[in-house]
Amino acid sequence: MIDEALLKLLVCPKSKAPLKQVGNELICEVSGLAYPIEDGIPILLVEEARELDKGSDKK
């Protein structure tokens, strides 16, 4: 789990929007990217992010 104070400082490198932690990923709803967290370290590289499925978490 990422420290709450650190999470408030982190932003998506593509959109500069805030991130939220879901499991072992940091999610950017603006850019539609999920950044992995490996061994407690967020990997905030666009080329390492996966694209979110459109509408997968919205009803």
Swiss-Prot record:
Entry's Gene Ontology cellular component terms: cytosol
Pfam families: Trm112p
SUPFAM superfamilies recorded: Trm112p-like (SSF158997)
Matching Gene3D superfamilies: 2.20.25.10
Similarity comment: family membership: Belongs to the UPF0434 family.
Database matches in HAMAP family: UPF0434
Name of the featured protein: UPF0434 protein COSY_0767
Organism: Vesicomyosocius okutanii subsp. Calyptogena okutanii (strain HA)
